[in-house]
Amino acid sequence: MSSVTQPLAVPRPGVASLLRDYSELTKARVTTLIVMTAWTGAFFGAAKSGLPLVSWTLFHALLGIGLVSGGTAAMNEVIERESDARMRRTAIRPLVTGSMSLGHGMVVSLVMMIGGAGYLGLMTNWLTAALALMTSVVYLMAYTPLKKIHPICTTIGAFPGAMPPVLGWTAIRGHLGWEAVALFAILFFWQFPHFHSIAWLYRDDYANAGIRMLPVVERDGRSTAREIVIYAAFLLPITLTPFLLRFAGRIYFLAALVLGSMLFWVSLRMFTMNLAPSSPHSKKYARQLLLASVTYLPLLFAVMMLDRTI
């Protein structure tokens, strides 16, 4: 009696690499963070309306926002593919390596952006869809080209960067509110310590690509450090507005004071230390600030949401 051994099913070659390419194209990690901050806005929108904190509307909102965000990131990589090829940290992107064609990237981008906006309009409301598209337009048509022209690009980019919680809020509420403005302001001011620390760490890469971030234009580091301290100082009182608007309580108030003071202290250290490019401390303090900023924001929002539920 003979038996035939059936071959094991194996994944189709190229599927895993294609998924990795899509992840790189849509900046999956950044898109995930955007969805999480949008969730914060949706959370407080639901709490304000007396709606369930978990609902199908929330699902539709986060999915639509994620699609628009991922599509915008993909179009950014389409536009900046030549600059990306000149930077070590972005040279692995699929449009640079050739593992994905330019046409493929453009189609994915447009389908996600337009489809995501349409999905938001149909499943939540058209205000959110319009704001999402406006955010994409400002990011792609103002921030992206300005990166090659003037350091003000960081300020312009902070506007679309602060929109996710506003989108989450309007998706649930259907209109704007002071709570959404407060969340927008927190995210707006937080971006300066965060992105200036990144720009300082990768200033040589940016210089090679012709991207005129502040650390590239002002090589001594004083202007960068000064701007970091100023925005960190403004951020501290701004984070207290949720308490003043009474959508967060005393636990949040104390946490905002502690977290804000710690971020300001790290920012101040970067200002007081020697940040000359040749200094051995140059990247050390920028890296510490980057770590502090990426720890600060999720902790702040988590405490804000937790305080609302207890």
Curated annotation (Swiss-Prot):
Note: Carbon 2 of the heme B porphyrin ring is defined according to the Fischer nomenclature.
Organism lineage string: Bacteria, Pseudomonadati, Acidobacteriota, Terriglobia, Terriglobales
NCBIfam families: cyoE_ctaB
Biological function: Converts heme B (protoheme IX) to heme O by substitution of the vinyl group on carbon 2 of heme B porphyrin ring with a hydroxyethyl farnesyl side group.
UniProt catalytic activity: heme b + (2E,6E)-farnesyl diphosphate + H2O = Fe(II)-heme o + diphosphate
TM helices/strands, residue ranges: 30-47, 50-70, 102-122, 126-146, 152-172, 181-201, 228-248, 251-271, 286-306
Gene3D superfamilies: UbiA prenyltransferase
Enzyme class: transferase
GO biological process terms held by the UniProt record: heme O biosynthetic process
Coiled coil (residue ranges): none
Protein family per UniProt: Belongs to the UbiA prenyltransferase family. Protoheme IX farnesyltransferase subfamily.
GO cellular component: plasma membrane
Membrane topology: Multi-pass membrane protein
InterPro entries linked to this entry: Protohaem_IX_farnesylTrfase (IPR006369), UbiA_prenyltransferase (IPR000537), UbiA_sf (IPR044878)
Entry superkingdom: Bacteria
Protein's recorded name: Protoheme IX farnesyltransferase
Location of this chain's protein in the cell: Cell inner membrane
HAMAP family xrefs: CyoE_CtaB
Pfam families: UbiA (PF01040)
